A protein has these predicted regions:
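C-terminal catalytic/acceptor-binding lobe
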Residues: 172-211
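A conserved acidic beta->alpha catalytic loop
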Residues: 15-24, 73
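Residues at the starts of beta-strands that form the adenosine-phosphate
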Residues: 10-11, 35, 65, 174
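Catalytic donor-sugar/metal-binding loop of nucleotide-sugar-dependent glycosyltransferases
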Residues: 129, 152-156, 165-181
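Short, conserved SAM-binding/catalytic segment
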Residues: 28-33
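Residue-level signature of catalytic and energy-coupling elements of molecular machines
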Residues: 54, 72, 141, 168, ...
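Acceptor/aglycone-binding surface of glycosyltransferases and processive sugar-polymer synthases
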Residues: 41-60, 65, 77-158, 185-200
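Short beta-strand/loop segment that forms part of the nucleotide-sugar
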Residues: 1, 8-18, 39-40, 69
Length: 211
């Protein structure tokens, strides 16, 4: 949070009543900082739901650009600076692990291959030229979110990122990929599980057969 505040951004933390007492920590250290906000939800409702609520909060509060990024140190503040330099009122800026100069640090070879193949498969099914369909490091403009009708998205796992990418392309919103260095989380466990994988596969096959 301190690093983000140095680049003069407003911060929203979406907390699904987490057992690590996220709210208490944020309130203790940043309770008097008007640039740090926290949105508390009663229970765990999923990644996509958190983004939808976060986007709504941002738009309701008059922000023209909204950044989504992980809070576990996987996404780097220096990369955010690079993404912000490219922001555009009509485009989506996507932090990509799988373009030239993009990197992933700290993953096993198996996990790296699984992620790369999953992204390639997603691109193939949706006929997209985007290399990192599941990236959770993006800058959305107000225009792009309204054009996509983000509030009508259905997915809650990593399929949410694929769905948002597909909706952007189908609605004529340009996506610009910028290389980032993704670093494996410093603590905690990955949210990836079989339910999330099944949701993504279901979305992709439904999308393919509807076309």
């Amino acid at each position: 949070i301190d690093e983000l505040l140095e680049i003069k951004v407003n911060i929203l933390i979406v907390d699904d009543n987490s057992p690590d007492k996220t709210y208490d920590v944020v309130e203790k250290y940043f309770g008097n900082n008007e640039k740090v906000n926290i949105l508390i939800r009663e229970k765990k409702l999923g990644l996509g739901s958190a983004y939808r609520d976060g986007f709504k909060w941002g738009l309701d509060n008059g922000f023209e650009y909204l950044v989504e990024m992980d809070a576990d140190f996987s996404h780097q503040v220096n990369d955010l600076k690079a993404l912000l330099l490219e922001k555009d009122e009509k485009n989506i800026i996507l932090g990509s692990r799988y373009v030239s100069q993009g990197k992933v640090l700290g993953w096993s070879k198996r996990r790296s291959l699984l992620s790369k193949y999953a992204n390639n498969f997603s691109s193939f099914i949706t006929k997209s030229k985007i290399n990192d369909m599941t990236s959770g490091f993006r800058i959305y403009s107000k225009y792009s979110l309204e054009k996509i009708n983000y509030q009508n998205t259905k997915n809650n796992g990593y399929a949410f990122q694929i769905e948002m990418t597909v909706l952007a392309i189908n609605n004529g919103v340009k996506i610009i990929e910028i290389p980032i260095t993704f670093v494996e989380r410093e603590s905690g466990k990955s949210k990836m599980n079989s339910r999330i994988i099944i949701e993504a596969l279901k979305y992709l096959f439904l999308y393919r057969f509807k076309k």
